[in-house]
Regions:
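Short, compositionally stereotyped local motifs that mark structural "simplifiers"
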Residues: 21-23, 736-830
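C-terminal motif of bacterial Sec signal peptides marking the signal peptidase cleavage site
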Residues: 15-17
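Sec-dependent N-terminal signal peptides
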Residues: 4-13
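Short strand-turn-strand beta-turns centered on an Asx-Gly dipeptide
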Residues: 670, 694-697, 777-779
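Surface-exposed interfaces of beta-sheet-rich extracellular modules
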Residues: 681-698, 772-773
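Short proline/glycine-enriched turn/loop motifs at strand-loop junctions of beta-rich domains
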Residues: 167-169, 687, 766-772
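Surface beta-strand/loop "capping" patches
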Residues: 653-677, 744-764
Length: 830
């Protein structure tokens, strides 16, 4: 019997192992999730968010205004202020440029049209944060100077302001249509003693914004006074007086519309109608609770959970609905259109949000992602281009790239296809083939020369990534010629890489921009310096590694990035914030960098840096966001990273694994499935990954695929306090690599004076030392470059590279001979 006992024991273990594992339980709420949202996060520092009431992706943002201008007043509110000018119905969240603040109302005790910003008597009032409350869908504050309590709540296109006046005080409501933006035209119509309507057309970031409104007072006004007696024009203000013997409370129901006054009326009638303030608030908060339940987390740290759900909230207040309840909207041609098939949106901050916010939406907002893309294509029909940064039917001309393209490609390759795919691909190619914003030079040379366009390095790099996403969609559609064209363009990053410095650097047609300082903020980069753009090759990290000279070189450059001095030189750039060395988390070009360590077999360094950013650069305080929140992008980084992964390369269908922050998190998908993430033993100390299991199987890979998430299941991390060997094998690291249709990079002049006295010696080089260089002087026959040569007269030098029968673009540079008696002195810091 003894000799059979080990066999029986082994059989028992085997049978036990064969039993189906119990499913991993989903994360559970321990309270209302809206209780974890702190809308004041981001209202201080440079976050540029607002605390007022709004609905998920809603048209109305009903919020207090404490600032009339200034960079830190972009949202209309800053936590450091102690005076309120009033409560307006539209606001931007986290942007770096001001706009909105439309249709200001302010309850007060006297008829006064001056806002008080000039220090003279006005309708503004002091307030204290001790008597201020902000929740999803609700805001309340006490106005100290007039002893009035104000409460705000909203539906999607309408809202209610409720004022509680003190006993016996005079009851006055000021309507200011001149507030903040330059007014192009405005009008106020008195329909009855309880209803008024009108419009305001204004100019700021949006150069021709049109907004209509309709207001219903809960009791009739007894008198109305107009500034200078005017009800039309650029300075329309009105004061409405009410009988204070008929109760201390006045509510104002407001509907807004980009279409017309009828639209504004229908919007509030259908959304609010006869509902009470409390009913509207309750409905708003129930909708917010349902939205936040898309991801449920468990953890012991209250601040971390507050940061998470506030981040969820911030990713859901833009883009904004831009059509009335009847489907009508104002298009990019400023004409009125109608759609019944999808919701039409505005406020697409795509240079920011294509990186993480839109990838997050492909997980938790797939239906809305279809609406976003249908909106892009409709704007393409109306205005001739897809949005870059659109605002209220206006093109702002702000930011770079054509980042509607990766949003579409990412969605399409993830199976989100509720739109006209052929039109989408046509619009994507149209974005890439225009001759504006440096694209003409980019197509001709394979890069944008400094002398041709500002922000040339950033544009070259971002265009190259966008082109890669077009190539991926072309490949999926079987469009081989387009695939080749755009895959070649995706490699144009090679033409702005300087092998001597290992940085991405501005170049004239044939020569590098000099002198070069990677710390310098100048016109070659977008809101950044070379440190902050030199790692931007998400589409071909392997190719970038080859340029640098190997994985150890990329690792070394990343190490230097995070320990470099955190000062910049050159132009002062307010956007460069949240610095760890030269890593600038407060601005988007840095957002993928910490995850690049996974590509060089050092995932523990990604885990260290990601956890540092999560816990140091996001806090439960008004200044708890380290830069402009940027319409959800800063928050989306936090959400994805705290779950344990990030979208380094949208359209690759991969998320790179970092360091999960919570014990358990469940993503409740629109398809009815749940994906649960468990981090066993996670703590502030235990930030390193020991092992990972995906659906019960060992997962040695330092990335996860999108299909694994949307299929439902579980991802289990075992965390520890020391770096491990997990994810370090070459077979298990993420790879993005362009392997076919390889280009020949454009040669450059490594030595030689473009303007010279006597003569100059010219040395040519290429990023690829194995390619051949050919040159021609003054249209003579091309010669193989074999070494430095002299130029002693004015000459036109043409060069190109060649390898394996492929040629680079031909680039021409004119050399000028200077009179030796002429002296040139440059007096510029650039």
């Amino acid at each position: 019997m003894k000799r059979y006992f080990p066999l029986l024991l082994l059989l028992v273990f085997f049978l036990d192992a064969c039993k189906p594992k119990p499913p991993i339980s989903s994360a559970q709420k321990d309270r209302q999730l809206i209780d974890y949202v702190n809308p004041f996060i981001g209202t201080g520092g440079h976050g540029h968010t607002y605390p007022g009431a709004t609905m998920p992706f809603g048209m109305m943002q009903l919020s207090p205004d404490t600032r009339l201008d200034g960079w830190d007043g972009c949202s209309g509110y800053h936590y450091s202020d102690n005076e309120i000018f009033g409560f307006s119905h539209t606001h931007l969240s986290g942007t770096g440029v001001s706009d909105y603040g439309d249709i200001l109302l302010m309850p007060t005790n006297k008829v006064v049209f001056n806002n008080g910003a000039d220090g003279k008597d006005g309708y503004k009032s002091k307030f204290s944060h001790d008597k201020e409350i902000a929740e999803p869908g609700f805001y309340k504050v006490h106005l100290e100077d007039t002893n009035i309590d104000v409460e705000l709540t909203v539906s999607e296109r309408s809202g209610i302001q409720k004022y509680q006046f003190a006993d016996g005080s005079k009851q006055v409501i000021i309507l200011d249509l001149e507030h903040r933006d330059e007014v192009l035209d405005s009008k106020l119509t008195i329909n009855s003693k309880t209803e008024i309507s009108g419009h305001r057309f204004s100019k700021a970031w949006a150069t021709d914004q049109k907004l209509f409104f309709d207001m219903l007072f809960s009791k009739p006004f007894t008198k109305v006074t107009f500034l200078d007696g005017k009800t039309e024009g650029k300075k329309v203000k009105a004061a409405f007086e009410f009988d204070n013997t008929t109760g201390n409370e006045i509510s104002v129901t407001v509907g807004i519309s980009p279409v017309d006054e009828e639209g504004a009326i229908h919007n509030w009638q259908l959304e609010i109608g006869s509902k009470s303030f409390e009913q509207v608030k309750k409905e708003a908060q129930e909708i917010w609770e349902k939205q936040l339940e898309k991801i449920v987390i468990e953890g012991d740290n209250f601040d971390y959970k507050t940061n998470f759900y506030t981040s969820m909230y911030h990713t859901m207040i833009a883009p904004n609905l831009y059509q009335d309840v009847d489907g009508r909207y104002r298009g990019m041609d400023l004409k009125i259109h109608e759609t019944k098939d999808f919701d039409y949106y505005t406020v697409f901050s795509l240079w920011d949000t294509y990186r993480a916010a839109h990838p997050l939406y492909t997980i938790i907002e797939q239906d809305r992602t279809n609406d976003f893309i249908n909106t892009f294509l409709t704007k393409y029909d109306e205005g001739g281009i897809m949005p870059i940064w659109d605002l209220s039917a206006c093109y702002t001309g702000c930011m770079i790239g054509y980042h509607a393209v990766p949003v579409i490609a990412d969605a399409y390759l993830k199976g989100i296809r509720g739109y006209d795919v052929d039109k989408a691909f046509e619009a994507m190619k149209h974005s890439a083939t225009r001759d504006k914003l440096g694209l003409d030079s980019y197509k001709q040379f394979g890069f944008i020369p400094v002398e041709k366009e500002s922000e040339s390095v950033s544009k070259t790099l971002e265009y190259a990534y966008d082109d890669w996403t077009i190539a991926q969609m072309a490949k999926s559609l079987g469009k081989d010629n387009d695939y080749k064209i755009y895959l070649e363009r995706a490699q144009n990053y090679k033409n702005v890489f300087d092998p001597s410095s290992l940085f991405m650097r501005g170049r004239f047609r044939n020569t590098w921009f000099a002198p070069f300082d990677p710390y310098e903020v100048n016109f070659n980069y977008t809101e950044a310096n070379s440190w902050q753009y030199s790692f931007y090759v998400p589409q071909d990290v392997s190719g970038f590694i080859k340029l640098l000279g190997g994985k150890d070189k990329l690792e070394g450059q990343l190490d230097k990035l995070f320990v470099a001095e955190n000062n910049t030189s050159g132009r002062h750039q307010v956007d460069i914030t949240g610095l760890i060395g030269q890593y600038a988390h407060g601005n988007e070009p840095s957002h993928h960098m910490a995850y690049l360590y996974n590509f060089v077999n050092k995932p523990h360094k990604t885990q260290e840096k990601v956890r540092q950013i999560l816990t140091e650069l996001y806090t439960n305080t008004p200044d708890g966001i380290s830069g402009n929140e940027d319409c959800g992008q800063m928050s989306a980084w936090y959400i994805l990273s705290s779950l344990g992964f990030y979208s380094v390369t949208p359209a690759s269908n991969q998320y790179i694994i970092g360091s999960p922050l919570f014990k358990r998190a469940s993503i409740n998908l629109e398809n009815g499935k749940t994906f649960t993430i468990v981090a066993d033993s996670v703590s502030d100390k235990n930030k390193y990954i020991k092992s990972v299991q995906l659906n019960g199987k060992n997962h040695p890979y330092s990335y996860i695929n999108h299909k694994d998430i949307v299929a439902g299941g579980d991802l289990i991390f075992e965390m520890t306090d020391k770096p491990t060997s997990w994810g370090t094998d070459n077979k298990h690291i993420p790879v993005t690599e362009i392997k076919e249709h390889l280009i020949v990079s454009t040669p450059f002049i490594a030595k030689g004076e473009i303007a010279f006295k006597g003569s100059t010696e010219v040395t040519l080089k290429s990023v690829d030392s194995s390619s051949k260089i050919y040159y021609s002087l003054d249209d003579n026959e091309y010669k193989l470059y074999e070494g430095p040569f002299m130029i002693s007269e004015k000459s036109d030098l043409k060069v190109y590279g060649e390898k394996d029968g492929e040629k680079s673009a031909v680039v021409t540079t004119t050399f000028y001979k200077i009179d030796p008696n002429v002296k040139i002195e440059l007096k510029t810091e650039y």
